[in-house]
């Protein structure tokens, strides 16, 4: 599983020019599911997304990486993006052999969303499988790639 985490001041996703998901301060999560992903990988990524200290403490000048999205009562925008598993090493067209099938990916993506909703934070999403326009006001910019493969500690 791969997730690009971006700390944002604002983010929204549109489908056919209609806003389907929108957040304020929090994290934008671009999510890809691989052929080997299971609930174990999802659980690990969920914990990381919620607990990573990616926000500054406004009361401290010394510790930029002090608060998690939970600590600041931030918001989450989750967008499926299978292209994170695109392999561009050969030829001129990306290969998506490592991406889960749409049926499997949708099921695991929905499980990921449901587990994040259990945090009590506001969670917004795009529409799985749709062509989307994502607007991201990246704060910092702060962007990280989380990756968890089966049997990868």
From Swiss-Prot:
Disulphide bond pairs: none
Keyword NADP: no
Statement: the UniProt record of this protein carries the keyword Cytoplasm: yes
Swiss-Prot/TrEMBL domain comment: A Gly-cisPro motif from one monomer fits into the active site of the other monomer to allow specific chiral rejection of L-amino acids.
Biological process annotations from GO: D-amino acid catabolic process
Descriptive protein name: D-aminoacyl-tRNA deacylase
E.C. no: 3.1.1.96
Catalytic activity from the UniProt record: glycyl-tRNA(Ala) + H2O = tRNA(Ala) + glycine + H(+); a D-aminoacyl-tRNA + H2O = a tRNA + a D-alpha-amino acid + H(+)
CDD domains the record matches: Dtyr_deacylase (cd00563)
Class of the enzyme per the UniProt entry, highest EC level: hydrolase
UniProt record similarity statement: Belongs to the DTD family.
